Amino acid sequence: MLCARRRGADKDPASGVVTELKPIVEKLRQAWPEVRIILRADSGFCRDAIMSYCEQNTKLDYVLGLAKNSRLIKRIGAELAQAQKLHQSSHKAAREFKDFRYRTGHSWSCKRRVVGKAQYLAKGANPRFIVTSIASEEHDARSLYEDFYCARGDMENRIKEQQLGLFADRTSTASMRSNQLRLYFSSFAYILIQTLRRLGLQGSELAQAQCDTIGLKLFKIGAQIRVTVRKVWVSFSESYPYLHLFQRVFARLEQIPGGA
């Protein structure tokens, strides 16, 4: 996790993104000066300011979803017709891809590479588009969309995991500042659990478990705590079913320098 910031419902989804990106890119560059950074996001972040910022920085590229419109759909008309024919003959989802240059009427400062996916399903046409700074010589249209952009779904799953398992979507106070503080707490908890996955749960049955599952099996457990002069004793119930896992994870954490 690099950033967690709330925005008002009356603001553009991409409001403040460049401001947040600049210090993140600077920190990454300090640690890995030669590493290439690629920004991947849905169409809510397809804004000229974000794309221009990436284009002005070396080894900083983007692959962003692009909302469809009549001009874009017209550009892939032949591919949509071909996909429809394939669907009618196979009765399966069919898709064709087209690579072209495109510029909006007013909001973009220059032409950019756009990949159109002309997909035809049982319910009808389903055109999709992305815009990118990555050259076609590096990734053709199909691989860029299917292998790279669609992998964004895993990122969305991580966001949902934090929302559902760690209450990142809770905004029940009247103040934006207090709701932002709640999001920070949720984000800190996610980072701690992710660190536990990496250092303590690797190779165990919970290595790929989601936050709520880890919390239920390792955190939300009944125990008796007794404090003496030199020690804190934690006594688990004999019926606790994950005691062996808890002990194994705790032992791993103890082996980390400065750990438990």
List each language-model region with its residue ranges.
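A short, flexible helix-boundary coil/loop motif
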Residues: 192-260
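Short amphipathic alpha-helical "interface-anchor" segments enriched in bulky aromatics
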Residues: 144-181, 185, 189-196
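A short acidic (Asp/Glu
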Residues: 47-52, 73-77
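Short, surface-exposed basic-aromatic patches at helix termini and helix-loop junctions that form
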Residues: 51-60
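Active-site-proximal loop/turn and secondary-structure-junction residues that shape catalytic pockets
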Residues: 8, 43-45, 68-70
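Short, conserved catalytic/metal-binding motifs centered on acidic residues
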Residues: 38-46, 62, 130, 155-164, ...
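Electropositive, glycine- and tryptophan-enriched low-complexity nucleic-acid-binding patches
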Residues: 1-33
